[in-house]
Amino acid sequence: MRRSKYFTPNEVSLHNTINDIWVSYLGKVYDLTPLLEAYKGDVLLKPIIECAGKDISHWFDPKTKDILTHVDPLTGCIKYYTPRGRFIHIPPPCPRTDWANNFGKPWWKDNRYEVGLLSAKTRWIRIINTLTSQEQKLEVCSEESLDEILHRYLFYNSHAASYTWKLSGINLDMSKTLSENGIPEEDEFYCGSPDCNLFSPSICLYFNDDLTEL
């Protein structure tokens, strides 16, 4: 079984329009575009649209994985806590006969929208093609294997699989992560500074003379 794909927060943030809206919460990434299409024009979409491309884990109780609740000061009843305003599949504050509750699972419990996992930590690396001397800086997920990083790099070099990946002259195990290959984390002190590039691992690609280039 193929494992779930990892995404960086930056990748999630690119999906921030009404026609392409992703959010992340509790470590997973969701594509809510079909939800917006199904409820197009509904005012209850507003809080979701406002958070397009962002992490909304603070909406949830990490233990129950449900929306946070609170005691309504007026009724004394336990209700969902939605400080940004009520949104799709949240029941109205008072009983109403016109509220349709036949939607099945609420969207935040519906696995249909799940597209992958949110990386707990991202890393910057430099990939140097020794054949062409081209260098590409990539933000990758620390949980990804080198094979999965290779798939990211295919955007820049469609023949990336025709190269041997090395660090300091040592062949890398493509089935393992950067850390599992003994590549240490870059110094946190330099992250976000002009010197960050100096501390990003440089992976060198050496061309294999094979038939995949034909």
From Swiss-Prot:
One of its GO terms (molecular function) is metal ion binding. Disruption phenotype: Mutants are able to survive to adulthood. Embryos constantly develop three otoliths in the otic vesicle at 24 hours post-fertilization (hpf) and recover to two during later development. Mutants show impaired coordinated ciliary beating in the otic vesicle and olfactory epithelium. Pfam families: Cyt-b5. Residues 4-70 form the Cytochrome b5 heme-binding domain. It is found in: Cytoplasm, Cytoskeleton, Cilium axoneme. Keywords: Cell projection, Cytoplasm, Cytoskeleton, Heme, Iron, Metal-binding. SMART domains: Cyt-b5 (SM01117). It comes from the Eukaryota. PROSITE patterns: CYTOCHROME_B5_2. Heme binds at Y39, H70. GO terms for biological process: cilium movement; regulation of cilium beat frequency. Selectively expressed in motile cilia-rich organs, including Kupffer's vesicle, otic vesicle, floor plate, pronephric duct and olfactory placode. GO terms for cellular component: cell projection; cytoplasm; cytoskeleton. Radial spoke stalk protein that binds heme under oxidizing conditions. Required for the coordinated beating of multiple cilia maybe by functioning in a redox signaling pathway. Belongs to the cytochrome b5 family. This is Cytochrome b5 domain-containing protein 1. It comes from Danio rerio. The lineage of its organism: Eukaryota, Metazoa, Chordata, Craniata, Vertebrata.
